[in-house]
A protein has these predicted regions:
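Bacterial N-terminal signal peptides that target proteins for export
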Residues: 1-9
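Detector for intrinsically disordered, low-structure N-terminal pre-sequences
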Residues: 4, 13-14, 31, 62, ...
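Immediate post-signal-peptide N-terminus of mature secreted/exported proteins
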Residues: 22-75, 152-160
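Long, amphipathic, charge-rich alpha-helical segments that form helical bundles/coiled-coils
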Residues: 36, 70-143, 147
Length: 160
């Protein structure tokens, strides 16, 4: 989890924002920024879903189901993020936004909000880790541990 927070903070995802009133963006900038924000909404939703599922998990089957669902959504996030990045990376619009004060402010606001959400999810990942340890003898738990590791590796590669 710590490496995920480090990834979010250090990746320099200068194209991510959440539109806020008061920070004027033209229609093209807003469209690009919204496109980059959409995959992160998927990831935040996946974290929230995992939190709710782990809280109500009563057995290893519930933990496996929760972890599998998180992996499905987190992998969807990676796929959608990569598609957006391929579409816009290196474009003139993205380059122009690097020098736009309003775009930078939107990016800062989004990154601050995202950082808070990711830091708040630390307890969820700690609870998941505890549940995975508690049911470690289950073959399905071992499978889902491997799947979680692969998924987290994909998430970390988003920055590349």
């Amino acid at each position: 989890m710590q490496s995920l927070v480090k990834f979010i903070l250090s990746a320099g995802l200068v194209v991510l924002i959440m539109p806020r009133p008061g920070y004027a963006l033209d229609a093209d900038q807003k469209a690009v920024l919204d496109a980059y924000k959409k995959p992160w909404d998927i990831y935040v939703s996946a974290m929230e879903g995992l939190e709710n599922s782990i809280k109500s998990a009563n057995n290893d089957g519930d933990v496996v189901k929760a972890a599998d669902k998180f992996c499905d959504e987190a992998n969807r996030f990676v796929d959608e993020y990569n598609a957006v990045r391929e579409k816009y990376q290196g474009s003139d619009l993205i380059k122009s936004m690097d020098n736009d004060a309003d775009a930078k402010k939107n990016i800062e606001d989004f990154m601050t909000d995202l950082r808070k959400k990711i830091e708040a999810s630390k307890g969820t990942f700690d609870a998941l880790k505890s549940d995975l340890s508690k049911y470690a003898s289950s073959p399905e738990i071992k499978r889902v541990q491997n799947r979680l590791a692969s998924t987290m590796n994909r998430i970390q590669l988003v920055e590349l």
